[in-house]
Amino acid sequence: MFVARSIAADHKDLIHDVSFDFHGRRMATCSSDQSVKVWDKSESGDWHCTASWKTHSGSVWRVTWAHPEFGQVLASCSFDRTAAVWEEIVGESNDKLRGQSHWVKRTTLVDSRTSVTDVKFAPKHMGLMLATCSADGIVRVYEAPDVMNLSQWSLQHEVSCKLCCSCISWNPSSSRAHPPMIAVGSDDSSPNSMAKVQIFEYNENTRKYAKAETLMTVTDPVHDIAFAPNLGRSFHILAVATKDVRIFTLKPLRKELTSSGGPTKFEIHIVAQFDNHNSQVWRVSWNITGTVLASSGDDGCVRLWKANYMDNWKCTGILKGNGSPVNGSSQLGNSNPSLSSNIPNLQNSLNGTSASRKHS
């Protein structure tokens, strides 16, 4: 049973992103009003805004939390072509904010010449690293060599994706069998049939990221992308938000089937595809065990998807924009989890509404 709580966010323009911290008791929001707000959950379950500040000189597209092992750290990215790292500190004894916490900017990352469309911290086992992607088609990976000094970040990698980038996701697996991996989505809407999702893998020999795979079946603009938490699986699960919701499995091929010294090759299958939103899908997000996927779309609803014991994915819940659930199995629909020879039949046209995006 879901309990919905409405929050008067007091942003003065569109809210583009909402991000929860590791424990789910803190929340950050960002908006076209150029600000970020931090919210804390009280013991009664109410959310209270505990900080609000102007972060950029343009619309703020994304905000994300670092793992709490590195402190209370946020990163944001903006249309102003920058990403920024923020840290919450407690006022010193000689500070007028003595004993009070407040957020300070630790660094501004200025390497992009175009809108920075997404920013994500790497899994904590990799240290304090973050990746950004930009409308110029470049993914950049930064590292803070000293976690006690967040003003120093070094640009470690620049990866060209050939298409404007809209979203990125780190593979969260900490297994030594899985090298660091980043999935990149593009919302390029030019009339071509180029694939919009690319997978890049870190190569220990060359110490560079190289393209491992391309999801050739995703040719529509991609708005969000998310690897599922791994929890010991030998394969990866990737969710893609485009004109519908798609879930892929990526199973690494045996080493003898891949080129020596080259990136891992994968056997890629689409295991679910849902057009229930009947509109553009803007966000996908996994629960902590990687067993439930939430998606939100222009229909104003959040839908929850879960696989059964046969690995067939079905819609298990729908929440309207006002937080009220949609009752009745007819509303849930048969979400077509079984995809095989009938995949082409699912490419039905969707009458989704267009929305202003980052490159306009």
Swiss-Prot record:
**Which InterPro entries would you find in this protein's record?**
G-protein_beta_WD-40_rep (IPR020472), Sec13/Seh1_fam (IPR037363), WD40/YVTN_repeat-like_dom_sf (IPR015943), WD40_repeat_dom_sf (IPR036322), WD40_rpt (IPR001680)
Q: Which GO terms describe its cellular component?
A: GATOR2 complex; kinetochore; lysosomal membrane; nuclear envelope; nuclear pore; nuclear pore outer ring
Keyword Electron transport on entry: no
Activity regulation information from UniProt: The GATOR2 complex is negatively regulated by the upstream amino acid sensors CASTOR1 and SESN2, which sequester the GATOR2 complex in absence of amino acids. In the presence of abundant amino acids, GATOR2 is released from CASTOR1 and SESN2 and activated.
Report residue spans for region: Disordered.
326-360
- Where does the record place it? Chromosome, Centromere, Kinetochore; Nucleus, Nuclear pore complex; Lysosome membrane
Which residues are modified to Phosphoserine? 190
Q: Which GO terms describe its biological process?
A: attachment of mitotic spindle microtubules to kinetochore; cell division; cellular response to amino acid starvation; cellular response to nutrient levels; defense response to Gram-positive bacterium; mitotic metaphase chromosome alignment; mRNA transport; nuclear pore organization
- Pfam families, alphabetized: WD40
Q: Which UniProt keywords apply?
A: Cell cycle, Cell division, Centromere, Chromosome, Chromosome partition, Isopeptide bond, Kinetochore, Lysosome, Membrane, Mitosis, mRNA transport, Nuclear pore complex, Nucleus, Phosphoprotein, Protein transport, Repeat, Translocation, Transport, Ubl conjugation, WD repeat
How it assembles, according to the record, is:
Component of the Nup107-160 subcomplex of the nuclear pore complex (NPC). The Nup107-160 subcomplex includes NUP160, NUP133, NUP107, NUP98, NUP85, NUP43, NUP37, SEH1 and SEC13. The SEH1 subunit appears to be only weakly associated with the Nup107-160 subcomplex. Component of the GATOR2 subcomplex, composed of MIOS, SEC13, SEH1L, WDR24 and WDR59. The GATOR2 complex interacts with CASTOR1 and CASTOR2; the interaction is negatively regulated by arginine. The GATOR2 complex interacts with SESN1, SESN2 and SESN3; the interaction is negatively regulated by amino acids.
Query: According to its UniProt entry, what is the function of this protein?
Result: Component of the Nup107-160 subcomplex of the nuclear pore complex (NPC). The Nup107-160 subcomplex is required for the assembly of a functional NPC. The Nup107-160 subcomplex is also required for normal kinetochore microtubule attachment, mitotic progression and chromosome segregation. This subunit plays a role in recruitment of the Nup107-160 subcomplex to the kinetochore. As a component of the GATOR2 complex, functions as an activator of the amino acid-sensing branch of the mTORC1 signaling pathway. The GATOR2 complex indirectly activates mTORC1 through the inhibition of the GATOR1 subcomplex. GATOR2 probably acts as an E3 ubiquitin-protein ligase toward GATOR1. In the presence of abundant amino acids, the GATOR2 complex mediates ubiquitination of the NPRL2 core component of the GATOR1 complex, leading to GATOR1 inactivation. In the absence of amino acids, GATOR2 is inhibited, activating the GATOR1 complex.
Name the record gives this protein: Nucleoporin SEH1
